[in-house]
Amino acid sequence: MKRIAICPGSFDPITNGHLDIIERAAPIFDEIIVAVLNNSSKQPLFSVQERMELISEVTEHLPHIKVDAFNGLLVDYASTVGADVIVRGLRAVSDFEYEMQVASINKKMNDQIETLFMMTNNQYSFLSSSIVKEAAKYGASVAGLVPPAVEEALRHKYSEGELR
């Protein structure tokens, strides 16, 4: 049976921390779907399409990676695409508390889907998309925090006057 996992997130934008988790999860599964949450209640810097394109570009070196977008409940999406594992990266104990609650609710809604927690590499334990956007907004270098393609996309966005 084919093992399909989902790495879900907003990815606004994808960071080296996200990429680290995806790269480390890739050899464990036959296929990984990097699933971009289309959350209409948020005002993202990058559109869903832009985020999907950036993720595709920075994961092109990895076999068996697909990029998709979803709305609604993650467990419903997982069932739709035939995934039986949700991969979540954890930076700190504070992440674990929230993620454990979400995993428990997901398990209650669909007991066929497991959640796999992976600890982030120490060098990315402080990293978030919000921190990256805040730094980039004020012209600080985000080299080493995001892949070069994302760094360029951020530079382009903020040179156009996007100040979210």
UniProtKB/Swiss-Prot annotation:
Subcellular locations according to the entry: Cytoplasm
Entry-linked CDD domains: PPAT
SUPFAM superfamilies hit by this protein: Nucleotidylyl transferase (SSF52374)
Keyword flag Transferase: yes
Keywords noted in UniProt: ATP-binding, Coenzyme A biosynthesis, Cytoplasm, Magnesium, Nucleotide-binding, Nucleotidyltransferase, Transferase
EC number: 2.7.7.3
Function recorded in the entry: Reversibly transfers an adenylyl group from ATP to 4'-phosphopantetheine, yielding dephospho-CoA (dPCoA) and pyrophosphate.
UniProt-recorded name of the protein: Phosphopantetheine adenylyltransferase
Name of the coding gene: coaD
